[in-house]
């Protein structure tokens, strides 16, 4: 990004950049752009849901479909954008490596009867049993 270092107090993303951008590039860039004590917060799909998406990417399964370890780039759905995700240990290592302290990891669970933007009632039911989306809140130290 053509902006000076330490330009912002907050870097926030609701899916978007942290879903479709490589975290090995986006996390260091967020660290560069934040001032000391700046907030980095973003939401995206959980590593678990990435492991449980059907082979055709059309539905989420109640079983593991893909390996957890080694996940990074998901580009096997023709015609769809590339998505990125990492195992939890790798997220933590990446945040620490770039000077972040994790303040919170919120695993979103829709309440019973919630209005939702999930693609189907089956996805909503799945998200009531396992975390489908999460919110990270990290502080630059």
Language model regions located:
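Acceptor-substrate binding/catalytic loop of class I
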Residues: 44-52, 76-90
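A short glycine-rich, Lys/Arg-flanked "PGG" loop and its adjoining helix->strand segment in the class I
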Residues: 24-39
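Short alpha-helix
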Residues: 72, 81-105
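Class I S-adenosyl-L-methionine
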Residues: 76, 108-128
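Core SAM-dependent methyltransferase catalytic element
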Residues: 98-101, 119-141
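A short acidic, Gly/Pro-enriched loop at the edge of an enzyme's catalytic core
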Residues: 1-10
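A short SAM/SAH-binding and catalytic strip from SAM-dependent methyltransferases
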Residues: 9-24
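Conserved class I S-adenosyl-L-methionine
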Residues: 39-72
């Amino acid at each position: 990004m053509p902006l000076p270092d330490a330009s912002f107090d907050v870097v926030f993303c609701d899916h978007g950049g942290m879903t479709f951008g490589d975290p090995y590039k986006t996390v260091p860039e967020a660290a560069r752009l934040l001032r000391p004590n700046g907030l980095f917060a973003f939401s995206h799909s959980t590593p678990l849901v990435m492991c449980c998406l059907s082979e055709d990417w059309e539905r989420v399964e109640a079983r593991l479909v893909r390996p957890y370890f080694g996940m990074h780039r998901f580009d096997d759905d023709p015609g769809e954008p590339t998505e990125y995700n990492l195992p939890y240990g790798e997220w933590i290592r990446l945040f620490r490596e770039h000077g972040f302290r994790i303040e919170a990891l919120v695993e979103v669970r829709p309440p019973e009867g919630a209005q939702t933007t999930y693609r189907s009632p089956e996805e909503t039911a799945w998200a009531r049993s396992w975390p489908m989306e999460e919110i990270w809140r990290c502080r630059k130290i």
